[in-house]
């Protein structure tokens, strides 16, 4: 019977603040190699939107094409909300043009459509069609592929009435970045195959779903952790060492008194400095500082929010420093 590989929310973004370019490129290339290896166990790969984080740069397009032109099984793609240009439209339209993707295994659906692989029938409901409330008609036995934000209590509300998806026996969704079943419905999010923002939990898993159909109605769903390098944020106390990780990209928040933080040099490993509340015992190290620098340190010490404007105003007094 049919085996389905499902991924979503790759968010290819090579020019991300505080993320080394070559490390990010290498991370995606490692992901591509693992996806190609998983293809050997599957009949079809569904990519449920948000391959890109935003309108891509040329190097990001080339990176995507290096993978997509290498896939060896039928691969179906729908755009997500990050690939939308205006209501109902997506820049993925450009990838449907002749010779944009030179691999006959790949099909991009920017409009509602259907396709079959073996005994599996798919109905595609891209993000732009959802925006226009153009739900495709239900065909018995179809698997729905779409990109819709579900509810994440208490702050994230659903953008669609999920009860309308209930006729489909299985819905493969993109948007939410963590792997889970949506409530008690037949809707499943594979989550992102790699973390797209800095995590504090190094053990959190990211990957893809594999569906193994035992007959035309029953299937087994398996989550596969791709174990890719992660973006990690750690918090340490001033004086602790910021250690470079050989696999993950780790940045550090450093806490301490204002005088302790003033002695910490800015490096690629430093995310930000967090000043502890000032106390009577804390003293500012004002050696080799001019008057403007002293004022800047003092304003930060007493936690003035708009210290830059205060310093700029002070400079207009033209005091000899």
Model feature map: region roles:
Residues 1-6, 114-124, 139-143, 184-187, ...:
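Beta-strand-turn-beta hairpins that frame and shape the catalytic cleft
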Residues 6-8, 45-50, 75-86, 107-112, ...:
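Active-site neighborhood of phospho(di)ester-bond hydrolases with catalytic His/Asp-centered motifs
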Residues 154-219:
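Conserved beta-sheet core of the metallophosphoesterase superfamily
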Residues 1-63, 67, 135-141:
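N-terminal active-site segment of His-dependent metallophosphoesterases
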Residues 15-18, 49-67, 84-103, 156-161, ...:
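Metal-dependent catalytic neighborhoods of phosphoester/phosphodiester hydrolases
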Residues 44, 213-321:
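Accessory, non-catalytic peripheral segments of nucleic-acid enzymes
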């Amino acid at each position: 019977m049919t085996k389905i590989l499902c991924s979503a929310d790759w968010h290819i973004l090579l020019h991300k603040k505080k993320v080394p370019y070559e490390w990010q490129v290498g991370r995606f290339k490692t992901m591509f190699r693992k996806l190609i290896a998983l293809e050997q166990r599957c009949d079809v790969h569904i990519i449920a939107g948000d391959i890109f984080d935003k309108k891509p740069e040329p190097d990001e397009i080339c990176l995507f094409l290096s993978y997509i032109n290498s896939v060896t099984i039928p691969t179906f793609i729908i755009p997500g909300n990050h690939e939308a240009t205006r209501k109902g439209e997506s820049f993925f339209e450009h990838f449907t043009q002749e010779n944009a993707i030179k691999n006959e295994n790949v099909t991009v659906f920017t409009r509602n459509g259907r396709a079959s692989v073996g005994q599996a029938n798919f109905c595609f409901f891209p993000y732009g069609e959802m925006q226009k409330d153009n739900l495709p008609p239900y065909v018995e036995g179809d698997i729905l592929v779409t990109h819709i934000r579900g509810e994440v209590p208490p702050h994230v509300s659903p953008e669609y009435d999920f009860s309308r998806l209930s006729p489909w026996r299985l819905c493969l969704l993109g948007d939410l970045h963590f792997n889970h079943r949506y409530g008690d419905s037949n809707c499943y999010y594979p989550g992102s195959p790699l973390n797209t923002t800095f995590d504090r939990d190094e053990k959190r898993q990211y990957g893809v779903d594999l569906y193994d159909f035992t007959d035309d109605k029953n299937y087994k769903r398996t989550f596969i952790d791709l174990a890719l390098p992660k973006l990690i944020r750690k918090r340490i106390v001033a004086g602790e060492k910021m250690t470079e990780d050989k696999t993950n990209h780790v940045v550090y928040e450093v806490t301490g008194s204002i005088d302790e933080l003033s002695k910490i040099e800015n490096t690629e490993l430093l995310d930000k400095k967090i000043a502890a509340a000032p106390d009577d015992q804390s003293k500012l190290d004002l050696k080799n500082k001019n008057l403007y620098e002293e004022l800047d340190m003092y304003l930060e010490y007493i936690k003035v929010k708009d210290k830059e404007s205060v310093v700029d105003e002070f400079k207009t007094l033209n005091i000899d420093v």
